[in-house]
Structure formats: C-alpha cells, structure tokens
C-alpha cells in the first residue's frame, strides 16, 4: 500500500488498531522512553503523545516497533514479503538483461517499479508552510526526548540527514543521532564509513575551508525513512529506492538555503551547514548495545533555517538494550539481506541476525555445503560482501538441516559438529564498531567464525556421526492415532 506522507501512515495504523493516542501529559524527559519501551517489549502499537509536558507539538514514537509495521512502511503485506524487496535490491546491485521471454516476464514487475525511481521536484511543499530563519530558529520548540538518566542532553534520533559530496550527482540519506547543544546547534554523530561522513570528508578535500551544506528532515513518509536504513547500492539514491518501495515517485522540494532536495511532506526540516574544524564532545548516551557510549568529538551542525508543516508532528525513538526499535528494524531488514547474499552466494539457505546480538554483531548462516572449507569461504564472504556486516563480530555457519532462527538447533550443531581448535577462525585487527568497548582499541578489533557444519574428508580423519531420524512410516502411523491416545490431554 502507498502512503503519501507520515500522516497518511499514522491514519492507516490507527484504522488498523496499530496506533494509540495518549492525551495525558507525558514528560519527554525519561517518561516517554519508559512508556515506549514497555509498549515495544509487549509488541504494542505506535504511540502519539498529544500533550508533551512543556510543548504544544505532539511526539510520535514506536512507529516501527513491530516487524509487521516495518513491512507496512515498505509497502509490503508482511515480513516474509520483504524478501521481494531484497530481490529488487539484488537486481539493482548487479543488473542483468533478461535472457529470453520467460525471464523478461519474470522481471517485468521490477522494470515497472523502476519507473518510479526518478524524484518529482515540486515548486512548493507542505514542509515549508512555516519558515523560521536566523535568530528565529529555535530547537526549544521541538519536544526532543531525553531518553536515559545518564544522557548528557536531549537527542534527535530519527533525523534523516541529507548530504551531497563534490564527486557524486546523487544525494545521500542517512540516519545519524544528533545531540542538542543550543537553540540552533546539534552535533552530527556519524562514523567514518557512513555516507554523510564520506561526503563531508570529500567536500573538505575539494573545497578546503568552505562550509558544507546539510539538511535534516524529521517525519518524512515511511518509504523515505526506511529507504535511508536499507542497504541500497552506493550508486543509487535512497530517494530513488523509496520510489521503488512506494510505487510512486518521491516528491521533493529544493531547500531554502542550498541546492539539496528535501522530502516535500516532511514534518520538520532543519537546514544549515558544518563549519570545517568546528567540533564538540558528543555523549555519553545510552545506546543500542545496552550501555552508555564513550564521549568523542564530532562536527557541529549550525541551523540557519527551520521549516515546518502546520501542526507539525515530531518523530522520535530511543535506543537501549534489545529489543528496541533498531533491533526490530534489524529483524525486518534481515529478510531483505537474504536475497542479496544468495545472489552472491547461492549456497546460502538462510541468514539470521539475532536481535539479542545488537542487530548485527552476530550472524547465523545455513548453507548447502559442497566441499571442504566451504563454511570458511562463506564466513569470509559475509564479512566482506556488504558494508553492513563489516562490524559483525561472530559468524556461525551451519548445514541446511539446522534452523538458523532456532537457538536450540544452532547450539546443538555447535556442540556436536565443532572442534574448538579446528573449527574456529579468528581474525585480528579488523574494523569494529566504535561503540564496542570490548574491543582493545576503539574501532579496531577481532572477529570469530564458527564452522558448525558436518565435516567432510579432508576436514577430519574420523568416521562422522549420522543424525538419528525416526522411520517415516512409524511417524505417520503415530500421527494417525495421536489424538486417540490423548496423552497430553
């Protein structure tokens, strides 16, 4: 289903019983986090806080608090259908002409969707109904959440950050958290490998000393938001992918202060710049790991223009020990990753990122094993194929008779098919998550691969065990009399 903007999505969620309006006064300082956290852990609805303490602007949280709501936002009927999104991405990553009429007909839906990828630029847009600039810019008008007791300041969490480097035509969209440090200043916390950081670095090389234009959109339509967190190919704009998801072209409008394009239906837009050399200490903040992160310096975003829709809604979230909203997104996006990986490694049967592993720090892969050493090839491939997995610390590879999503199955495979010395691969001095304080050096650590597959000749000299399997005829006979036996009542 198509959603023209965030408000349309909210209306559909409410109609489906997936949104709860809270009219009681709730404080953005800690209280919204506690209510949102309890709701998410119970699989509850999105929340619209209509009366934030001290503010007139409502706050939307838990928008993507269940995998099914993520699928809805991507225009799909359920989580399983997200595999189709992964199929689109795998084709866009490595497009191939159809080989014959049959393949042409199979790929026709993709070709039709591609027509929705170019953006549609408007001359005016709802996101610019109200305009504040210069001294009138005031972030204090926005009920920015202060999520955890140890957080240093309020934190913008769903800021859709729009940048363009000097060497690329396409714009980059990314979600980076932003600490509020003044009425017109935020800290732009992005890691070196993220698209926005790369654009800024290249800008400073090409235009030394010049200000770098940046726009942050809050409350865009769901397809645009989710497009920014999906592993789209580097050559493809997230706006284009959002059009593919939505089934209609993404409507944008030129920013007032620069040539960047912003989502036309966004609730709030912050325009401004990064001044080269202007840094500020960011953090500590409670993060998706379940811990407070270290303090480090990041660029300062100075806001020159703040535009809004009338009666704007502030879209927010919190991060903490899983499950949180990023973990839920990880569960849903897991389905998108499977076809991408299978295109490169057809032997992969399933791929699972357990949410308890902070969404990406551990992966379980099942394969149709073909030769000795196959599991090691796959684990090395996972670490290197997609940028999203460069921070995955543990990769467990099992045979296709194991359910990657069932820990009982996976643990059985590890304990019966692995020799710790032979089947463990350790790699040192690799890129690691900056937030991973367990690594010996910030941003640099090790990885472990576990080969929990059945071993082939060449991998072992011993006769390998045969799994116990009941006779199929006996199973069918017992099935036929099971209800009559009434053993379990």
Swiss-Prot record:
Residues at the active site: 287 (proton donor)
Cofactor details (free text): Binds 1 prenylated FMN per subunit.
Alphabetical UniProt keywords: Cell membrane, Decarboxylase, Flavoprotein, FMN, Lyase, Manganese, Membrane, Metal-binding, Ubiquinone biosynthesis
Cofactor field: prenylated FMN; Mn(2+)
Pathway info: Cofactor biosynthesis; ubiquinone biosynthesis
Organism: Aeromonas salmonicida (strain A449)
Function: Catalyzes the decarboxylation of 3-octaprenyl-4-hydroxy benzoate to 2-octaprenylphenol, an intermediate step in ubiquinone biosynthesis.
Protein name: 3-octaprenyl-4-hydroxybenzoate carboxy-lyase
One Gene Ontology term of the molecular function aspect: metal ion binding
E.C. no: 4.1.1.98
Single Gene Ontology BP annotation: ubiquinone biosynthetic process
Residues bound to Mn(2+): 172, 238
GO CC terms: cytosol; plasma membrane
Catalytic activity as recorded in UniProt: a 4-hydroxy-3-(all-trans-polyprenyl)benzoate + H(+) = a 2-(all-trans-polyprenyl)phenol + CO2
InterPro entries named in the record: UbiD, UbiD-like_C, UbiD-like_N, UbiD_bacteria, UbiD_Rift_dom
Annotated family: Belongs to the UbiD family.
Compartments where found: Cell membrane
Class of enzymatic activity (EC top level): lyase
Binding site for prenylated FMN: 175-177, 189-191, 194-195
Predominant subcellular localization, coarse grouping: membrane
Assembly and interaction partners: Homohexamer.
Keyword Lyase attached: yes
Keyword tRNA-binding: no
Extent of the signal sequence: none
Topology with respect to the bilayer: Peripheral membrane protein
């Amino acid at each position: 289903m198509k959603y023209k903007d965030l408000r349309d999505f909210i209306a559909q969620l409410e109609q489906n019983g997936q949104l709860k309006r809270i009219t009681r006064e709730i404080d953005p300082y800690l209280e919204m986090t506690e209510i949102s956290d309890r709701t998410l852990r119970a699989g509850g609805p999105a929340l619209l806080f209509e009366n934030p303490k001290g503010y007139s602007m409502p706050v939307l949280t838990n928008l993507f608090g269940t995998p099914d709501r993520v699928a809805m936002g991507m225009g799909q009927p359920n989580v399983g259908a997200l595999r189709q999104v992964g199929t689109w991405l795998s084709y866009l990553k490595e497009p191939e002409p159809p080989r014959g009429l049959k393949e042409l007909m199979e790929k026709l839906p993709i070709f039709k969707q591609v027509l929705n990828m170019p953006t549609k630029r408007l001359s005016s847009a709802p996101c610019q109904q109200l305009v504040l600039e210069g001294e009138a810019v005031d972030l204090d008008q926005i009920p920015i959440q202060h999520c955890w007791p140890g957080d240093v300041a309020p934190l913008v969490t769903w800021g859709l950050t729009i940048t363009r480097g000097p060497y690329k035509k396409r714009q980059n969209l990314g979600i980076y958290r932003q600490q509020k440090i003044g009425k017109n200043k935020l800290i732009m916390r992005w890691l070196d490998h993220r698209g926005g950081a790369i654009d800024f670095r290249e800008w400073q090389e090409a235009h030394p000393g010049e200000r770098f234009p940046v726009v942050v959109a809050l409350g865009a339509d769901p397809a645009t938001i989710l497009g920014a967190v999906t592993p789209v190919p580097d050559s493809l704009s997230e706006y284009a992918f959002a059009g593919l998801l939505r089934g209609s072209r993404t409507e944008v409008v030129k920013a007032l202060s620069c040539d960047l394009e912003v989502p036309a239906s966004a609730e709030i837009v912050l325009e401004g710049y990064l001044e080269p050399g202007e840094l500020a200490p960011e953090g500590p903040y409670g993060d998706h790991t379940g811990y407070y992160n270290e303090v480090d310096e990041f660029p300062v975003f100075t806001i020159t223009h703040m535009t809004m829709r009338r009666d704007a809604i502030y879209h927010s979230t919190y991060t903490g020990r899983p499950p949180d909203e990023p973990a839920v997104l990880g569960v849903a996006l897991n389905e998108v990753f499977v076809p991408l990986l299978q295109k490169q490694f057809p032997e992969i049967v399933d791929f699972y990122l357990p949410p308890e592993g902070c969404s990406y720090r551990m992966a379980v892969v099942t394969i149709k094993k073909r030769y000795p050493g196959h599991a090691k090839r796959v684990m090395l491939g996972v670490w290197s194929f997609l940028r999203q997995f460069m921070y995955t610390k543990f990769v467990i590879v099992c045979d296709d008779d194991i359910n990657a999503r069932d820990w009982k199955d996976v643990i059985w495979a590890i304990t019966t098919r692995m020799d710790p010395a032979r089947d463990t691969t350790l790699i040192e001095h690799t890129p690691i998550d900056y937030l991973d304080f367990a690594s010996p050096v910030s941003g640099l650590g090790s990885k472990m691969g576990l080969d929990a597959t059945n071993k082939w000749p060449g991998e072992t000299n011993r006769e390998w065990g045969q799994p116990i399997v009941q006779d199929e005829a006996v199973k069918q006979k017992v099935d036929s009399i099971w209800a009559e036996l009434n053993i379990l009542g």
